[in-house]
Amino acid sequence: MFGYSHVNRQYDMHMREWYTDDRIVGVLQDCEKAGINTWQASFNWDMKRIFPKLRGAGCNIQFICLAASWHFDEKMGRTPEEVLDGTIKCAQAAMEFKPIGIAFHGHATDLLFRAGKIDLLKTYVDKVHDMGAAAGISTHNPKILATLHEKGFGNDFYMAGLHYLSRHPEDWIAELGTVPVDEGWIASDPPKMAAAVRQVDKPALVYKVLSAGRKCSSEDQKRKAIAWAYQNIKPIDATIIGIYPRYSNQVAETTQMVREALS
């Protein structure tokens, strides 16, 4: 809803143009009516306008926030300590909207891991618990998910990207011998993350189920991608599926596909 298309800047703008405050409220009302009880979104300062309108319209959908230092202030530094501090500040700002959970951003987690500072996440988890919300940790890398499980930082849930979008060029060279033009969406990623998700004992919210629209060429392709996700995660897990209902009723379409997958 805030223009994260994972396609290009033009498509980001296309989404932002359509998703006015009133449309965001309307879509979330439609979600709630269709049986979707939780909205997950990255922290955005526009929420200070949107949430009063949303609650004023009688929508009680739950909110899970994805926090990152750059969402709080894009000018903040990117050292591990600065990312931790900024993400905690982001989580504190998000508490205004009464989230049921706040997750540490996947790119931020992956940054800490590369820097050998993954233990800083324990501080984040403790701070979010002190705020009164469930604490989550997101990642794009199945190896990091396994490490988090071993470390046992006390978080309540994970967010797990089915595509490893935080690879560095050297990672691509080591794995595939080349570097992609875009973020890098490859078919071998989802099974690896799904396998890691099945090995952790906490709930995981799995995202990039439709590969940011790359598995939306047909209704059958979408249906198969959603079914595959549910067939390969734990019963206590759930999916995060982005919608952009500009041209069709994606709320109804997606909820129907999820119900079919779970039937």
Functional labels for PLM-detected ranges:
Residues 1-4, 39-41, 61-66, 100-104, ...:
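Hydrophobic faces of well-ordered beta-strands that scaffold small-molecule active sites
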Residues 11-16, 21-31, 35-40, 56, ...:
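Structured C-terminal cap/extension of enzyme domains
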Residues 149-180, 184:
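Histidine/lysine/aspartate-rich catalytic loop segments that bind and position anionic ligands
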